[in-house]
């Protein structure tokens, strides 16, 4: 499926979070909770300013990000994979490794 994102929209693949219980048992999936980290897999052209110019996004494809998992983040299934669609303003940080 081809998707063309509008404005400052970003598609993110959520990274699975691995954590350990107090007893040292590794928890994965729903037992570990939802991660607020992900990888950017698609970006729009940028935010349209009042003067009509387009401000490019700070994030790019391949970036690992930390995001706000709020009401404005939409979950969609694309090519049988759950992804998140959000505005760049929902992104809190870019993780530099």
Swiss-Prot record:
UniProt keywords, alphabetically: Chaperone, Cytoplasm
Main location: cytoplasm
Cellular component terms per the entry's GO annotation: cytoplasm
GO molecular function, one term: unfolded protein binding
Source organism superkingdom: Bacteria
Compartment annotation: Cytoplasm
Keyword Cell membrane: no
InterPro entries: Chaperonin_GroES, Chaperonin_GroES_sf, GroES-like_sf
Family statement: Belongs to the GroES chaperonin family.
Quaternary state and interactors: Heptamer of 7 subunits arranged in a ring. Interacts with the chaperonin GroEL.
Function as written in the Swiss-Prot or TrEMBL entry: Together with the chaperonin GroEL, plays an essential role in assisting protein folding. The GroEL-GroES system forms a nano-cage that allows encapsulation of the non-native substrate proteins and provides a physical environment optimized to promote and accelerate protein folding. GroES binds to the apical surface of the GroEL ring, thereby capping the opening of the GroEL channel.
Stated name of the protein: Co-chaperonin GroES
